[in-house]
C-alpha cells in the first residue's frame, strides 16, 4: 500500500485492487475502429431475460465501461452516525451515460463480493461462469470493517485524491469481464440486460426496490391495495426508461409489470402521499405504484430522476394533444394510402417478410388461411404460413383478437387463436374481453418492428381482398380446375389444396356475399359455403394506410397498452408464457430498416376511440378530429363510410358529425360560397337477409337509423337543409352508393359494391383514414375501440378549386383523384378532368352519372333498394315482375354498355312508408338501441 493510500484510508478501510488481479487472458481486449453502437444488445434480448444472479451478458463485448467520480455530497444523517459522504459516479458505455450515487461502504461491500467470487472460481475452475449466486452478504456482514468516522472522511483536503483513487479502482475492475459481468458489480453499477438496448432509449434509472402490491385502476379489479391493510411488499428490480417503467423478479428475470407514462403521470415522495417511510409514489391513469427506498435521500433522488426521465424524449405522452389524442402530430411522416385490399394485403405481405423483431396484429376478425397475394400458386403468401416462417426465424408475433359473443357473431375467434398458437411458440394470441359486452374491439392494425404500421378498415379476413375490377364471379379456369375436397374425419380441414395451377382469386370461404349468407364453418376454410355457379360475390371496397417512423411507434404503443392491459386483467394471461411488451423509444424511430415504397411525407396524428373496458383509459379523439375537420373545411368534403348514423337528438344518437355537416352547408349558403359534400354509403347494410322481402330485422334496424340521419325526421340532414333552402340542398350535397355488373351462367347480373371504407377527405389537404364508422359505437370512445390517423399534407402541387388555381396536398389529391377515377370509370372517359371537385360542371357531371347509372340498373335488374318501393306492398309487387336481364339478356347487355363507372344515387325513399325498427318481440327488438347506433 502506498503512502497516499495510507493517508486516504488511515483506518485500513482501503480497497486494494491487486487482491483481484487476473491473468492477462482474462482481461477484456477492446477493439479499435468499431462503432460501439453496433455492439449493443439487440432489441429481442427483452424476450430472453435471465435471473439477475445468473451472470447474464449485460455489457456489450469489446465496448469499454468508463467510470468517473464527478463529485461528492456530504450530509449529516443523524447524531449517532455522523457525517456521510456520497460519491457521484458517472459511467459511460458506448453512447450510454448514467450516474449512480454510492457511499464508501458500498465500495467495500463490492470489494468483498468480488474477492469471494474470485476465490470460489479458483476452487471450482470448471464451473466458471456457471455459479448462479455468491455467498449471502448477510453471512459476512459482521466481518465488514466500519466506515472511518474521522481522519480523511471528514477532511476536505483529501476529497479529490480519494475520488481519484475510487475512480481508478473502478476503472481497473471494469476492464476485466470476469468482474464486470458479475452480478454484484452489475447491481453496484445499477445495470441489467435492459440497460444497453438502443431501441429502448437512454440507460435510464435502475436498482433494487421494494414495491407494494395493488394500486391498479382497472374496472372490475378487486384486490387489497391503496387505503387497504392487506397488501404485501416484494423485492423487485426496477427499470425506468423515457416513457415507461417496469419491474422484474430478480430470481427469474421475468418482467412482472410494465407501467406506461401517460397524462396521469405524477411522482410524489414522502410518507403523506405514500403512507410509507422513504416511499415514492408513481401515478398514471392505470396504476398508483408505491415503492420503498432505503433512505429519504434515495427516495427524493429517485423521485427526481424518474420525473426528469419522463420529461425527456417520452414527454409527448405526458399530456393530451390536438383533438385530445394521446399522440401529437408527427411532421415528416412517410405515409401511403391503399384503396381496396389487393394493394394493402400485398404491402402487408412484403412488410411481414422484412420483419426482424416483432409483429403486432389486432383485428376484429382474422382468418389465418387468408392469401395476401393472388391468385395463389403456393402457400408462400398465406398469412399463417408467413407468420410461422417468421416465428421460426426468431420474430415474436403478438396477436390481439376480439372475443365475440358466439351466439351473435360467427367469426370464430377461438378457432383463429388455436390455429395460430399451434404454429410456433413465438406466436402468442390473446382474446378480449371475457365478459359479455355490447361493444367490440373493432380496430385493424399490423405493426412490424414498431417502425412500420398498417391500419384502416381492412381486417386480415375472408371477403376483404378486392381490386378496382370488383369482380362478381370467380370460376377459375375451367380447363384447370382446383378440387377443394371435403375433408374426411381425421383429416386436416385447413389443408391447402394443390394450387400449382390455381386461377381462383377467392378460395373457399373467401368467396362470399354477406347479405346472401353470413360465414359459417370457418374451421373448414377451403370449402365453399355459397354456390359460386349461381350466386355472385359481393365486391368489397375499403381504404387502408401505412405509416412509418414515430407515427408507427405511436400505433405500436397503443397496441402495447392494450396487450399489457389484457395481460394484467385476465388471469390466464398472467403467466410468463404471455410476455409483457415494451415500447421502443421515439428517439430511434427515424432509423428505418425498410420502407413501403410509394409513400409521401405529411404530418400524421394517431387518433383512437378507447374506454376503460377496452384499454384502461378514455379517449374519443377520432370524433373530435371529424368535427374539427368538417367545421374548418373551406371547399368540400368527401366521405366514404360503412355507416352513417349521426345527428344528435341527445337521447338515442349522440355524435354530431351530421350536425356539423348541416352547419357547414348552412354557413356556405348564407355566405354564397361554393361548397360540396360527397357522401358514399353501401346501398344496404352488411347483414344476412332477403332484401326482396324487406330484409332481415338487422338490415332494417340499420336502415332506420341511416334514413333518420339522412332524410327522415326533424333531426335529419335533409329536413334541416330543406327548411333553410328548399331544393337548393342539391347544389351542396350528393348522397350515393356503388354498384357493378357482370355475367354468370350466360345472364347479366348485378350486385352492390359493399363500401366498408372509413375515410374523409377535406379540401384536398386533410385526410382521416381508420377503422371508425360514423356512428356512436365507433366515435363516442366508451363503446367500440377504434383507430384512425389524421393526415395533413405538407407537400403541395398545383391543382384547381372552383376554377381557381389551388395548391393541393399530394397525399389527399392523389387519393381523391384515384377514388373519383374508379367510381366514375375514367378509364373509358379520357378527357375527364378530376382536378376540380367543386366547380359546377364537375358536380353536375357527378350527379348526372349517378342518376343515369341508377336508372339503367333499375330498368335492367329491378335491383334493390329502389325509390320505387316505398312500402312492403310495393316491394312485393316490384319483385314479382321479371327483370329485363331475365327476359332478354342480349338487350340487357346492350343497355349495360351505357353504364359509366359504378356511381348510383342512394335511394332515399326506400320503404319510407314503413317502420323499420325491429319488432319488440324479436331478438333484435330486445337488443338495446345503442347496439344499432
From Swiss-Prot:
Which cellular compartments is it found in? Cell membrane
Q: Where is this region: Catalytic?
A: 441-788
**Domain PX: residue ranges:** 65-195
Expression across tissues: Ubiquitous. Highest levels in brain and lung.
EC class (word): hydrolase
Question: What reactions does this protein catalyze?
Answer: a 1,2-diacyl-sn-glycero-3-phosphocholine + H2O = a 1,2-diacyl-sn-glycero-3-phosphate + choline + H(+); 1,2-dihexadecanoyl-sn-glycero-3-phosphocholine + H2O = 1,2-dihexadecanoyl-sn-glycero-3-phosphate + choline + H(+)
Q: Outline what the protein does.
A: Function as phospholipase selective for phosphatidylcholine. May have a role in signal-induced cytoskeletal regulation and/or endocytosis.
Write down what this protein is called. Phospholipase D2
What's the source species for this entry?
Answer: Mus musculus (Mouse)
